[in-house]
């Protein structure tokens, strides 16, 4: 099983502000959907609350120390029990938030990274990557357009 993280960050590693993403980029949402559909997605409670609903065509697992009940969502109280629950899948995706990324980035096999080519204010950050540990498997640059305010770089990184 491949353990992957998927995240969008600014150049200053911002991933959120006030429990929301401080940008709206349809290109990144499409990238996220393309790379997570059909796979189990693991997220923290705050990330689920910011999304507001289970993601369709995915097994939605919410990690929380406290019992969490919501239709279409599986609650687990530990990362290990979540992984054990979806152990038969080829790939599992950790989709946030900040604390889980910090804790589990060192264990990740793969990273789907959207680099938003700007710096923004935020209160939640992705850890600084050590690029020596990663090999670029995919790299696509997309210029800003009428729907996407910022240039984006879409990367798939695999651990060396």
Curated annotation (Swiss-Prot):
Result of altering residue 74 to V: In strain: Isolate R1042
Impact when changing residue 69 to K: In strain: Isolate R1042
Effect of residue 67 to P: In strain: Isolate R1042
Keyword RNA-binding in record: no
Pathway the protein acts in: Cofactor biosynthesis; tetrahydrofolate biosynthesis; 5,6,7,8-tetrahydrofolate from 7,8-dihydrofolate: step 1/1
Catalysed reaction, written as an equation: (6S)-5,6,7,8-tetrahydrofolate + NADP(+) = 7,8-dihydrofolate + NADPH + H(+)
Disulphide bond pairs: none
Enzyme class: oxidoreductase
The enzyme's E.C. designation: 1.5.1.3
Entry binding sites for substrate: 6, 28, 53, 58, 114
PROSITE patterns per record: DHFR_1, DHFR_2
GO MF, one annotated term: NADP binding
Family membership: Belongs to the dihydrofolate reductase family.
Misc: Isolates R906, R1042, and R1047 are trimethoprim-resistant.
General function of this protein: Key enzyme in folate metabolism. Catalyzes an essential reaction for de novo glycine and purine synthesis, and for DNA precursor synthesis.
Protein name: Dihydrofolate reductase
The organism of origin for this protein: Haemophilus influenzae (strain ATCC 51907 / DSM 11121 / KW20 / Rd)
Organism lineage: Bacteria, Pseudomonadati, Pseudomonadota, Gammaproteobacteria, Pasteurellales
């Amino acid at each position: 099983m491949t353990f992957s993280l998927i995240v969008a960050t600014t150049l200053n590693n911002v991933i959120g502000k006030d429990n929301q993403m401080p940008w709206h980029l349809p290109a990144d949402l499409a990238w996220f959907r393309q790379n997570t559909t059909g796979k189990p997605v693991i997220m923290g409670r705050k990330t689920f609350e910011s999304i507001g609903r289970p993601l369709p065509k995915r097994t939605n697992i919410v990690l929380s120390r406290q019992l969490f009940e919501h239709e279409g969502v599986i609650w687990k109280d530990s990362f290990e029990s979540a992984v054990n629950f979806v152990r038969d899948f080829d790939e599992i995706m950790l989709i946030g938030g900040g604390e889980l990324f910090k804790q589990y980035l060192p264990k990740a096999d793969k990273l789907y990274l959207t680099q938003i080519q700007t710096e923004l204010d935020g209160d939640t950050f992705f850890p600084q990557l050590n690029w020596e540990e990663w090999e670029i498997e995919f790299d696509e640059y997309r210029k800003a357009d009428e729907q996407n305010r910022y240039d984006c770089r879409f990367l798939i990184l695999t651990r060396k």
